[in-house]
Amino acid sequence: MTHDNKLQVEAIKCGTVIDHIPAQVGFKLLSLFKLTETDQRITIGLNLPSGEMGRKDLIKIENTFLTDEQINQLALYAPQATVNRIDNYDVVGKSRPSLPERINNVLVCPNSNCISHAEPVSSSFAVKKRANDIALKCKYCEKEFSHYVVLAN
């Protein structure tokens, strides 16, 4: 909210609000998670001021609710995100993503020789948390990559 207490992004009556997305990540989430493949109204706030983060992105999707699996898959991109469930303009549920064991149908394998590029199969990566990184192992080529490599792909 600004100092004059006006919302910078219009409130929604019913749906999902993904808040505290790192700045410059909002569009990537919309694309990767195919959030725009809906007839519902989507409101996007980019580079909004944030007391905690400095700047943040925000996504509001009317009449759409994310599954727990979808929420947890956000953890790679926006580990500090808050996913709010809205009903009649009130927050009726709030959750934070936690790193899942597997991410399906979202990422693309960076190995150009992986069979997933030539065959009509859904991507699938096992998630392994390490001391300073998160590793993703492709189900098909069984190669392991730093999550930064996969996310940049």
Curated annotation (Swiss-Prot):
Co-factor(s): Zn(2+)
Protein name listed in UniProt: Aspartate carbamoyltransferase regulatory chain
Species lineage: Bacteria, Pseudomonadati, Pseudomonadota, Gammaproteobacteria, Enterobacterales
Gene name per UniProt: pyrI
The organism's place on the tree of life at top rank: Bacteria
Family stated for the protein in its record: Belongs to the PyrI family.
GO biological process: 'de novo' pyrimidine nucleobase biosynthetic process; pyrimidine nucleotide biosynthetic process
Role played: Involved in allosteric regulation of aspartate carbamoyltransferase.
Alphabetized NCBIfam families for the sequence: ATCase_reg (TIGR00240)
